[in-house]
Design a protein with these regions (language model features):
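Extended hydrophobic leader/signal-anchor segments used for secretion and membrane insertion
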Residues: 1-182
Length: 182
């Protein structure tokens, strides 16, 4: 049987962990456990209407999937619950911008290119199915429209613009900075 001090120690540690987690979320810190980005802690920065306007190639951003769900493929992935590690379809989707308005995305021999330069993180061919479920796909080559961005995942099987195409800058909720990654 545990003594009262041991029980109170366990309760105190649990309360500290829960309180620290809640405080981190309020401070704009997010934990990423998905393989789509390096695992670790991320700080949400510039979470206002200027985030989408100011974001450029190489920036990590979070996309509000409810805002982007007018895109039929984003809506498909949301209904499957595949746009977040937790399975909650209302989570923000964190990706890297690899193309902006005016850029051209092409595919050659299974590699994806933006303006003739291969993606540095994710050069693998797109999956066509998950089990027997066909996945949406984007016809390439594709010129990115002004006011849109092309997103890439760090993981070869990550859900990104290879499946849903360019997304509107207005769906960018925040820019993201790594606080600590593995």
């Amino acid at each position: 049987m545990r003594t009262k001090p041991t029980v109170w120690l366990i309760v105190g540690v649990l309360a500290g962990v829960l309180g620290g987690t809640a405080g981190a979320v309020q401070a704009g810190v997010r934990i990423n456990l998905s393989p789509s980005m390096p695992k670790g802690l991320y700080r949400l920065v510039q979470c206002d209407e200027t985030a989408g306007r100011d974001a450029g190639v190489g920036d990590w951003v979070v996309i509000d999937t409810t805002e982007a769900s007018s895109n039929p493929s984003v809506a498909f992935f949301r209904t499957q619950g595949w746009l977040s590690y937790s399975g909650r379809s209302d989570d923000l989707l964190m990706k890297t911008i690899v193309g902006v308005g005016g850029d051209e995305v092409t595919e050659k021999v299974g590699r994806l290119y933006v303006n003739g330069t291969p993606f540095t993180k994710n050069a693998s061919r797109r999956q066509r199915t998950v089990g027997t479920l066909p996945l949406p796909s984007v016809e390439l080559p594709q010129r990115i429209n002004e006011g849109e961005v092309w997103l890439s995942s760090d993981h070869e099987k990550g859900i990104d613009s290879r499946y849903f195409g360019a997304v509107a800058r207005s769906s960018i909720a925040c820019k993201v900075e790594a606080a600590w990654t593995l």
